[in-house]
Amino acid sequence: MGPFGARASPEAGQVVKQPLTDDPQESLAQGESERLPPRFATYFHIHLVSDSTGETLNAMARAVCARFTDILPIEHIYALVRSTRQLDRALEEIAGAPGVVMHTIVDPGLRAALEEGCRKLEMPCIAALDPVISAMSRYLGARISTRVGAQHALTNDYFDRIEALDYAIAHDDGQGGQDLTQADVILVGVSRTSKTPTCIYLAHRGVRAANVPLVPGRPPPPELFELKNTLIVGLITSPDRLIQIRRNRLLSLKENRESDYVDADAVRQEIIAARRLFERQNWPVIDITRRSVEETAAAVINLLSGGRGKVEVLG
């Protein structure tokens, strides 16, 4: 591993096709364990050079690479590259593992040096944000800022996200019911319907999100039904998917005994009861069966931005 924390990879400079293990945790580059890879995949090196945290560049690279089937990237991340010395070290590592270079370098001198270095190495050098920034500049008729890491400035939005995160943690799993009126949205659903991760993701977007579990034999907190101006969203999923998730949860806890928690009939009754509650209260419903946490959060944000009528967002 180099000084910038490059990912583990095949031998430097190679684009290889190799059999993958049966364990998806081991076989996916970057630890993407949510989808099974093809039995054979092509690996390639992608170098991400940033003068800031690298988060924007990393997200863009992953989004682009996801569009190619059977091709898995080996990421090499070079963050906080703000001097010629740091750039030279990055170029040394890039030379040892030929591939694609993407960057979000702002400083003109460093950009030129990186592009020249890649030209000598005969590697593509992509300024990831340039097309979008140029188009925005032309449309707005505004000059482009050269301030490094401008998106990470300590603005009011930053502190709003911190407060939203604190709120989500304090109001997870039905806690803090006394001040649910402070929530922008409350997610309601049976156990293992991604309520907590969705709330955390929403918090990173500055949304104050609480969640309330629906537990068989236990009525929801009465405060939930007294709210007038807070968006409440019901989360549901298919019985088969819910049983699978719950069984995996029990296995992780080394709990093997059968119970209503994973009983097919009991799970179906839980979901039916949840649906009936949502219908009675006229709460919008999101089916998370085929949705990632990010997609569920996006659907919630759409509901926050638009109407709050009786809507069901299908998976």
Curated annotation (Swiss-Prot):
GO molecular function: ADP binding; ATP binding; phosphotransferase activity, phosphate group as acceptor; protein serine/threonine kinase activity
Superkingdom per UniProt: Bacteria
Presence of keyword Oxidoreductase: no
Binding site for ADP: 189-196
Family recorded in the similarity comment: Belongs to the pyruvate, phosphate/water dikinase regulatory protein family. PDRP subfamily.
Residue ranges, annotated region (Disordered): 1-32
Keyword Kinase: yes
Cross-referenced NCBIfam families: PRK05339.1
InterPro entries xrefs: Kinase-pyrophosphorylase (IPR005177), PPDK_reg (IPR026565)
The reaction(s) this protein catalyses: N(tele)-phospho-L-histidyl/L-threonyl-[pyruvate, phosphate dikinase] + ADP = N(tele)-phospho-L-histidyl/O-phospho-L-threonyl-[pyruvate, phosphate dikinase] + AMP + H(+); N(tele)-phospho-L-histidyl/O-phospho-L-threonyl-[pyruvate, phosphate dikinase] + phosphate + H(+) = N(tele)-phospho-L-histidyl/L-threonyl-[pyruvate, phosphate dikinase] + diphosphate
Function: Bifunctional serine/threonine kinase and phosphorylase involved in the regulation of the pyruvate, phosphate dikinase (PPDK) by catalyzing its phosphorylation/dephosphorylation.
EC number: 2.7.11.32, 2.7.4.27
Protein name from the UniProt record: Putative pyruvate, phosphate dikinase regulatory protein
Lineage, top ranks: Bacteria, Pseudomonadati, Pseudomonadota, Alphaproteobacteria, Caulobacterales
Enzyme class, first EC level, given as a word: transferase
Alphabetic keyword roster: Kinase, Nucleotide-binding, Serine/threonine-protein kinase, Transferase
One Pfam assignment: Kinase-PPPase
